[in-house]
């Protein structure tokens, strides 16, 4: 058995991980307080629970679809010398400014528009952040560093979130109204994200790149076209990206829709927030554990285990009707969320050329964001089409929202089958 050794992080690796701590504060807010805040705006605007869940799902779908379109283009452009850091910084600033601006919007529609812009900035920045990984660390350390990014992102993002949660829950004790508390929460998160980005901007230097070769814009589209052709010929990469499209769909959809799902089912708001806070604490050690497991066990095997466990989690969520079940769901998600994300990222990083990481991670982003578009859209559509209906399954009365979540089971199953084929082919090639 291989001995697992602790590694000492370099300054660049620490700076890279710190960005995960910064942007994770935003996504934690998106998965907890923001859906509840939008619910109050939607209720004031006359929307019922099913329409609220549908419009929230559609907003997530629009943002992910936009990133799926622009991500590969920007990723390929960023592979040119000197382009990666400036484009990364621009996307980060769009997310930070959008986050800060969400607190000053009037009405549910304006809020959704600003939310989409902030989510596009966040998701786009991750294309370049992920593409930095092969330059930030070595191939041998990639699984561990990737896992630590997610792990410390989960636990570090709790710091600003607790401040925001205390302000929202108890702000009235010090004369701060609910609306003002949310405005301040958006500002706290935006500042945290911006500050945590600065060390990476200072230390990162693009070491793997392609030369401009003329106009970088026209070269970008030419190389993107060539990459699509190459991926179709490299069956092991093509199958992996196709599998990733499906299995990561369920992961991202659960992250995006968890609070909205619980709110639509009428579960206690405070209980939902505390349960999702628990997810962060559970995800921290479990993400690190998966990074260490990858030194002893095959990465492909670990990803397969995560996919199967997520399939079981989704089946459990279909029958969720009470608060305690949501707490169990939160713990189960925390156990596997960071592992499957980190290992999927490093798995691709090991089978692609480092100097073209931007374009390949851009393609990965098409798959990830395109999948998230599929998942949130399916849930939104099923929820809207079955508005007001209830279903009796195994003696339980389930709401239409429960049935909508069940669509993810099929998507996980397809992803598992495709990944098994891709991993078998990758093992043959290596």
What are these regions (language model features)?
Residues 2-13, 205-241:
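Juxtamembrane intracellular "pre-TM" segments in multi-pass secondary transporters
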Residues 192-203, 405-430:
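Multi-pass alpha-helical transporter architecture, strongest
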Residues 102-115, 318-330:
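Helix-loop junctions at membrane interfaces in 12-TM secondary transporters
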Residues 69-82, 285-299, 383:
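Helix-to-loop junctions at the C-terminal end of transmembrane segments
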Residues 86-100, 301-316:
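Structural signature of the two symmetry-related core transmembrane helices
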């Amino acid at each position: 058995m291989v001995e697992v050794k602790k590694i000492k992080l370099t300054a660049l690796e620490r700076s890279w991980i710190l960005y995960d701590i910064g942007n994770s504060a935003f996504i934690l807010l998106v998965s907890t307080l923001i859906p509840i805040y939008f619910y109050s705006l939607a209720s004031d605007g006359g929307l019922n629970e099913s329409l609220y869940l549908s419009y929230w799902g559609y907003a997530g779908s629009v943002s992910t679809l936009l990133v799926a379109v622009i991500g590969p283009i920007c990723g390929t452009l960023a592979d040119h010398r000197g382009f990666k850091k400036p484009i990364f910084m621009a996307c980060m600033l769009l997310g930070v400014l959008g986050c800060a601006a969400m607190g000053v919007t009037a009405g549910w529609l304006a809020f959704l528009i600003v939310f989409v812009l902030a989510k596009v900035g966040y998701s786009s920045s991750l294309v370049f952040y992920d593409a930095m990984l092969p330059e930030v660390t070595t191939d041998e350390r990639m699984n561990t560093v990737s896992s630590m990014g997610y792990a410390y992102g989960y636990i570090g993002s709790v710091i600003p979130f607790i401040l925001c949660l205390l302000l929202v829950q108890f702000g009235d004790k010090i004369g701060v109204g609910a609306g003002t508390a949310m405005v301040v929460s958006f500002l706290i998160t935006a500042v945290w994200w911006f500050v945590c980005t600065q060390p990476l901007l200072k230390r990162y230097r693009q070491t793997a790149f392609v030369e401009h070769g003329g106009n970088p814009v026209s070269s970008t589209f030419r190389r993107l076209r060539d990459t699509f052709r190459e991926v179709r010929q490299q069956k092991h990469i093509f199958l992996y990206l196709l599998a990733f499209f499906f299995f990561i769909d369920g992961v991202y959809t659960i992250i995006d829709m968890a609070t909205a799902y619980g709110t639509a089912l009428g579960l206690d708001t405070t209980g939902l927030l505390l349960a999702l806070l628990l997810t962060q604490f559970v995800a921290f050690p479990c993400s690190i554990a998966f990074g260490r497991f990858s030194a002893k066990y095959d990465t492909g095997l670990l990803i397969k285990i995560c996919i199967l466990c997520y399939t079981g989690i989704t089946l459990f969520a279909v029958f969720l009707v009470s608060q305690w079940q949501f707490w169990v769901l939160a713990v189960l998600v925390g156990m596997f969320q960071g592992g499957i994300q980190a290992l999927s990222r490093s798995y691709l990083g090991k089978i692609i050329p480092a100097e073209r990481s931007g374009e390949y991670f851009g393609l990965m982003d098409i798959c990830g964001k395109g999948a998230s578009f599929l998942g949130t859209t399916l849930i939104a559509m099923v929820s809207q089409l079955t508005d007001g209906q209830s279903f009796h399954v195994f003696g339980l009365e389930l709401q239409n929202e429960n049935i909508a979540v069940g669509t993810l089971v099929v998507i996980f199953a397809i992803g598992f089958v495709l990944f098994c084929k891709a991993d078998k082919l990758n093992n043959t090639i290596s």
